[in-house]
């Protein structure tokens, strides 16, 4: 979908660039496939801030998206919809065998009336899903499982995709957008194509209020705070913080590695950090 640019008829319109969603469904979502969503305000289970600068925003219903794609058969795309809970669009599909409805992530170039297939072996068409062991090498894929039957975890955001580059000894090798090359079991499911809404990154909301509608609060710099609030806070007059950049908890930020799961290091053939250095 294209971008919509607005004339500067008011300060809030100046510079405004939004996604043109005129081709999406304009009604309410499928009632059986939504449930209520309680806002957390960025707080965790103990009531403390877990993610800063979150809170408020418009009410949402959570769409129950099928990330597993384990139901075999042919389904017809009923319509494409906006989903406030993610950057990608979603597609309402209807299985031809029993009429069951489901939401899936909408890939690029998928439209109402198209057919999507979930099977052991499928054609390389956007929206079709199958295990990695049967997809041709070089296929562009998204919604990739890390563990069989757990549901897709990789490449689910707007415009995201990965590429299947090889297979060896029961594992598939996939190259991610970050440059990382990693192995996953070839029994894991993946969906053909790249995720919809690639222009999401080119939006300009134009004013702070639109960010607030999305539940984002102002992002305050540490050097603008008091010492009690942040390690960079305080000082007479404007300061640069006086130390290497850290988080509010005092841990290094700006590029410090945070990965701690050494058990899965063996599945990463080439780190995304090495990929960047090699360019």
Swiss-Prot record:
Statement: the UniProt record of this protein carries the keyword Nucleotide-binding: no
Assembly mode: Part of the 50S ribosomal subunit. Forms a bridge to the 30S subunit in the 70S ribosome.
SMART domains linked: Ribosomal_L2, Ribosomal_L2_C
Example GO molecular function: transferase activity
Family: Belongs to the universal ribosomal protein uL2 family.
Gene it is expressed from: rplB
Signal peptide: none
NCBIfam families: rplB_bact
Highest taxon of source: Bacteria
Gene Ontology biological process terms, A to Z: cytoplasmic translation
Native species: Caulobacter vibrioides (strain NA1000 / CB15N)
Sequence segments annotated as region (Disordered): 222-279
UniProt-listed InterPro entries: NA-bd_OB-fold, Rib_uL2_dom2, Ribosomal_uL2, Ribosomal_uL2_bac/org-type, Ribosomal_uL2_C, Ribosomal_uL2_CS, Ribosomal_uL2_dom3, Ribosomal_uL2_RNA-bd_dom
GO cellular component, one term: large ribosomal subunit
UniProt-recorded name of the protein: Large ribosomal subunit protein uL2
């Amino acid at each position: 979908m294209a971008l919509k640019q607005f004339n500067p008829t008011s300060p809030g319109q100046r510079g405004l660039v939004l996604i043109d969603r005129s081709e999406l469904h304009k009604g309410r979502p499928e009632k059986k496939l939504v449930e209520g969503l309680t806002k957390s305000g960025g707080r965790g289970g103990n009531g403390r801030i877990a993610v800063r600068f979150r809170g408020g925003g418009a009410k949402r219903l959570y769409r129950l998206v099928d990330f597993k794609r384990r139901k075999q058969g042919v389904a017809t795309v009923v319509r494409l919809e906006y989903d406030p809970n993610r950057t990608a669009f979603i597609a309402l599909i209807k299985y031809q065998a029993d009429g069951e409805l489901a939401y899936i992530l909408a890939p690029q170039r998928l439209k109402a009336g198209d057919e999507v297939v979930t099977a052991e072996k499928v054609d390389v068409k956007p929206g079709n899903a199958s295990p990695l062991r049967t997809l041709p090498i070089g296929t562009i894929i998204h919604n990739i499982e890390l563990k069989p039957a757990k549901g897709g975890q990789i490449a689910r955001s707007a415009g995201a995709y990965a590429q299947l580059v090889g297979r060896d000894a029961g594992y598939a090798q996939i190259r991610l957008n970050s440059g990382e090359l990693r192995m996953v079991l070839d029994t894991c499911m993946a969906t053909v194509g790249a995720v919809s809404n690639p222009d999401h990154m080119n939006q300009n909301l134009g004013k702070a209020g639109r960010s607030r509608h999305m539940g984002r609060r102002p992002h305050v710099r540490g050097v603008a705070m008091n010492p009690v609030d942040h390690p960079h806070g305080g000082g007479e007059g404007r300061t640069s913080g006086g130390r290497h950049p850290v988080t509010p908890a005092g841990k290094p930020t700006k590029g410090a590695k945070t990965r701690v799961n050494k058990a899965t290091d063996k599945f990463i053939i080439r780190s995304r950090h090495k990929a960047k250095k090699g360019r």
